[in-house]
From Swiss-Prot:
Keyword DNA damage appears in the UniProt entry: no
SUPFAM superfamilies assigned: NAD(P)-binding Rossmann-fold domains
Residues involved in NAD(+) binding: D38, D64, V65, Y156, K160, T191, T194
Protein name: 2,5-dichloro-2,5-cyclohexadiene-1,4-diol dehydrogenase LinX
Gene3D superfamilies referenced in this protein's UniProt entry, alphabetically: NAD(P)-binding Rossmann-like Domain
Organism: Sphingobium indicum (strain DSM 16412 / CCM 7286 / MTCC 6364 / B90A)
Amino acid sequence: MANRLAGKVALITGGASGLGAAQAKRFAEEGAKVVIGDLNEEMAKGVVAEIRAAGGDALFIRLDVTDAASWNNAIAAAVEAFGGLTTLSNTAGIIHPGGFEEESIEGWNKMVAVNQTAIFLGIKAAIPELVKSGNGSIINISSLIGMFPTAGNASYCATKAAVRIMSKAAALEFVDRGVRVNTIVPGGMNTPITANVPPDVLKQQTSQIPMGKLGDPIDIANGALFLASDEAKYITGVDLPIDGGWSVGV
């Protein structure tokens, strides 16, 4: 099936690499106009160039997801370029290990700002345009350890759990205004962020995956594509695990 996102305009945070870049390319393949919001201009423009070379339509907007003014500018730029906004994918995120004794308040606050508060800011900034579209979709990226926490990841577990509950609250708040809000819950993934996971932790996580391997960014992109499409018009407030069966065995 082609052009599953024809007529859609999608803003994807963290779109310069990893899960966000995979979504940007996949969305464009299916006809969406894509806005990549990121701080890494060089990598983001590389993704934009790939999309355009393949015949898609995309642009880069510098976006600091922790800053409300930056969000407002990004939404305005998307509307100016493409006439509106139908889809928001909150994919930007960070991770660093640290239990309750090791984690600093600075590290905690940074994790909360990027992984949690940024999603609040994004929803707040985008919702007027999403409502105006008449068929808006918000996709927030959580993590399996936001459902099943692990020791030694205090701030990451907390922020990714918050993403799930915040998504459900938003789903209820905007359901009668034509905006769906869903969460993707990735298991272990082959992404740049995985490089920050200690090898012993990564090995342990992989051993718990029934499929016996990490997922790839395209797996998340295909899930996000479905949730962004009209095929998911009756789906809101759900957690969609994409984890190789990991959550089944937890």
